[in-house]
């Protein structure tokens, strides 16, 4: 027979010792939970706040460019709001908000140099945005190199700003002036290649370069240019020029300059070139602003104009991924909605979008460079190829934008339609212009 097993003897663990083991186990679990919670806390501890990054600029809130300037300011403020409400910028382990420091330049180039000196030397802005318009951007650009500050251009598109003078620290987010009227000429070539063209444009560098580039392109396609004239930027009466363009036998009119003179041209067409009016009209800048249609009513119908951006042109993270590009910032709909929230329900036109994109591109470069150093941020701006709500961003060695695409818009029955290119159009171009 076998001897009794150990189990039949005295228990190895008494009830009292069992309670001690359970208590120790519970305490150990509590310690593990506490240690784990502490680890999670430190791993997710909010980054320390580093302060604000001051971005300085002048903007035209009064004077000739007040419509474009005001909308540009609103676009910049919209993107600043988005950045700050989405965690700010992380540089070297610290979080920074964006603060804006700006002055009204009154649309006068002569005001710009001293204001930028003040922004840099007295207000201590670390980075700069350029003013609205090519003349004012030209006046501001020297400060960027003189004081070694990165400056992003959102409203100065004349190629001459970069091609006539080397600009070390000036970078553009918008397509250059030489491409503005190309879409209009392309449409005419495809649909009315025998039309005769008249050009009437403002004597500033942007308007001149944009229109002359279009005329050269049109002539290379076989068009006849029967009238080519410019006018002072402060012109109050263009009836003589419009009458001369009509008498030259022109079918179409291209040119203009900015918002104020765009309205002037359209209002004076009613009495100078109305029997019949031009068959096709494409004007710079003015046409894209909602106020253009509000002030002109039916006279705006069928007028076309180039645009850097419209709300119906939807860039997205999905599109960026398909193109092999990184995506940054709000979607077009998010930008549009936030802009409306901050501005009484207003819808942004391209001046707001390009100005907002300028701040966003600057923010991306600062964060990717992980530095406030001008050389580091400028180098990042030169190497980036990204997509945001405004479209693609990439520059050449001079700082000129080479990746962004433009569209052609036309007012139709009180609505602004994108008519070119076909891939993003929400309407087809209407011809001829009737004046009503």
Residue ranges and their predicted role:
Residues 67-74, 89-164, 173, 231-238, ...:
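Beta-alpha junction/loop-to-helix N-cap segments that form part of ligand/metal-binding clefts
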Residues 270-356, 423-426, 430-435:
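Extracellular/periplasmic periplasmic-binding protein-like sensory domains
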Residues 125-228, 275, 279-314:
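Extracytoplasmic ligand/sensor domains, especially the bilobed periplasmic-binding protein
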Residues 45-57, 89-97, 189-195:
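Immediate post-signal peptide segment of exported/extracytoplasmic ligand-binding proteins
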Residues 68-91, 212-217:
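Short, polar/charged alpha-helical segment
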Residues 339-353, 361-418:
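Segments of small-molecule ligand-sensing domains
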Residues 56-77, 103-109, 132-133, 200-208, ...:
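Extracytoplasmic "Venus flytrap"
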Residues 1-49, 436:
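Secretory targeting signatures
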